[in-house]
Amino acid sequence: MISDSKLLASAAWDAQSLNELKAKAGEDPAANIRPVARQVEGMFVQMMLKSMRDALPKDGLFSSEHTRLYTSMYDQQIAQQMTAGKGLGLAEMMVKQMTPEQPLPEESTPAAPMKFPLETVVRYQNQALSQLVQKAVPRNYDDSLPGDSKAFLAQLSLPAQLASQQSGVPHHLILAQAALESGWGQRQIRRENGEPSYNLFGVKASGNWKGPVTEITTTEYENGEAKKVKAKFRVYSSYLEALSDYVGLLTRNPRYAAVTTAASAEQGAQALQDAGYATDPHYARKLTNMIQQMKSISDKVSKTYSMNIDNLF
């Protein structure tokens, strides 16, 4: 019988292991029930991940023919690693149903199915994107990027695409505004105790806000002149909560209707300024510059990835 360790240590797209399993299963079906069940469980997880990917926009920041190929292969490997060991419990249930009269080895003692929420899938995706960007962006261009900008983009790329799909706000605009308002995550608003507020979009705490707030000194413009003023800002428990509130703010307020229906991220940036999101008279231009920088990053990642695809595995 093929050992599980040998089977699961191989790459998810290793046809040799699958052919070996097929041959052995034909010779001794009973002895190979568990490896086959593991493969079925892996296929189930792959289908789950594929369904999640199909629900996302296909024109993301890092989306290209090559990155979609990489993501597909990556998902296959994730599915195989998720089903290693006790896995999700699906394989053991199939083994029990197929061999009801035979006691299971100690290894297969039933366990509660492992919880695997969407946030964990997102975390795997963020790690993959971060590694991809770290390896693919050329060194001379990499030096011009501030701080942990690549990690910042990787962390927000998938949530921004989901938010864009739900709200209509261009995802490049979401990323650009978060980067501009927070200094690529390095100058985000802090609470009084120094902890992060997760307020990536500089949303102020108006009278209808019932959540926690923090007061800081910020720059506002009056008649084109910059002034330092005290202002209260909303505090969130996570970046995802901040993103959700930001999307709600734009979609529920009629004055931002032109933002949610903008044909491009650049048009959305101008619509934000026209709607009075910020007092900075150059807000739209700053956002547009940030959007162009992100699109340039996307192009460089795609081109470099296509030339060095073998080095990324």
UniProtKB/Swiss-Prot annotation:
GO-annotated cellular components: periplasmic space
The family classification in the record reads: In the N-terminal section; belongs to the FlgJ family.
Question: Which enzyme class, named as a word?
Answer: hydrolase
Coiled-coil spans are none
Q: What does this protein do?
A: Flagellum-specific muramidase which hydrolyzes the peptidoglycan layer to assemble the rod structure in the periplasmic space.
Q: Which InterPro entries match?
A: Flagellar_prot_FlgJ_N, FlgJ, Glycosyl_Hydrolase_73, MGlyc_endo_b_GlcNAc-like_dom
Q: Does the keyword Hydrolase apply?
A: yes
Keywords in alphabetical order, please. Bacterial flagellum biogenesis, Cell wall biogenesis/degradation, Glycosidase, Hydrolase, Periplasm
The Gene Ontology terms for molecular function here are: amidase activity; hydrolase activity, acting on glycosyl bonds
Q: What else is known?
A: Probably exported via the flagellum-specific export pathway.
Name the principal localization, coarsely classed: periplasm
Active site per UniProt: 220, 245
**EC number per UniProt:** 3.2.1.-
What is the name of the protein in this document?
Answer: Peptidoglycan hydrolase FlgJ
Q: Which GO terms describe its biological process?
A: bacterial-type flagellum assembly; bacterial-type flagellum-dependent cell motility; cell wall organization
Q: Where in the cell is it found?
A: Periplasm
SMART domains the UniProt entry points to: LYZ2
Q: Where is this region: Catalytic?
A: 148-313
